[in-house]
UniProtKB/Swiss-Prot annotation:
Subunit structure: Part of the 50S ribosomal subunit. Contacts protein L20.
GO annotation (BP), single: translation
Function in brief: This protein binds to 23S rRNA in the presence of protein L20.
Organism: Citrifermentans bemidjiense (strain ATCC BAA-1014 / DSM 16622 / JCM 12645 / Bem) (Geobacter bemidjiensis)
GO CC field: cytoplasm; ribonucleoprotein complex; ribosome
UniProt GO molecular function: rRNA binding; structural constituent of ribosome
Name of this protein: Large ribosomal subunit protein bL21
The UniProt record lists the keyword Electron transport: no
Annotated HAMAP family: Ribosomal_bL21 (MF_01363)
Amino acid sequence: MYAVVKTGGKQYKVSEGDFLKVEKLEGAVGDTVEFSEILMVGGDKVVIGTPLVPSASVVGKIVEQGKDKKILVFKSKRRKNTRKLNGHRQLRTILKIEKINA
């Protein structure tokens, strides 16, 4: 069984036992998180939401809180010798999907 979950402005296809890297979620390591914005549930019978599947949820457990790899942002203006280099590390959460309720 799988589901399509919407979180952090993105959509993820998940199954039970999967590890998922998402935008930072509130909570400590070991806490459980429940997603109620389920767009689709698949398996023996596929249910597509309009836009959400009613009474469906996905439960996950927070495995790690941290930062992603550094992304370098380089800006320059032509013929002016103007350059700017910035670095950015996005906060992220790693989850383990425990249960899909359809």
